[in-house]
């Protein structure tokens, strides 16, 4: 059966700007839930705790939180976590896992998941830290990204920390970019991905075919590509300082060709 057909075969210019509103259904979410190992998540959470100097009971905003793997792991370490995401499937999954695990009860942490847009954070100075993991920073165009960064800045208290995880900086994807098809398999889910770079709009267009038995999904994702310097300027304009760049949770410095950018910053 076909679960959902998105904009996989329409011209690049016709891909809706709000592609992310319909993209994150069961097959994409389940694929990434399986692909992200416990070791990967633990390394990310170690990085967040150590680089931001978090103490037990810290109030953390995870936005967008996806299926909640970082939120759940942080809560299990004794933090008070709020996860926000626009995908109803991902939020439902995260809530179910939290309930099944009775997560964080022994450690004294808490976690709650809210359905909502990453730009609509009606909180002011209540979080000790915010995290934006897994490439979602590039989902929005420049105006939307500014709105998101401003919303996070309002939500984090003065002196609070921020971690942004982004694998689609210009320094990461453009050196050696070929656009060749890539096939990924996890369990009984297969994904074929084709990528093209829209130089006029500085966007990476990713067209996916997900397959799980008779279930198939074709969908297109857009990542707006920013330079490392541009990201730093966006954060500084919103009120963040002490911006530092890493290529890996072990603290490796970010350089040209690094496949991943982990930015840490402080709310001025």
Task: Give the label of every model feature segment.
Residues 146-158:
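A short glycine-rich, Lys/Arg-flanked "PGG" loop and its adjoining helix->strand segment in the class I
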Residues 1-58:
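Conserved class I S-adenosyl-L-methionine
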Residues 64-68:
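Class I SAM-dependent methyltransferase "Motif I" SAM/SAH-binding loop
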Residues 120-129:
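A short acidic, Gly/Pro-enriched loop at the edge of an enzyme's catalytic core
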Residues 69-120:
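Class I SAM-dependent methyltransferase SAM/SAH-binding core
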Residues 143, 163-234:
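SAM-dependent methyltransferase
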Residues 226-268:
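C-terminal lobe and adjacent flexible extensions of AdoMet/dcAdoMet transferase-like proteins
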Residues 128-143:
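A short SAM/SAH-binding and catalytic strip from SAM-dependent methyltransferases
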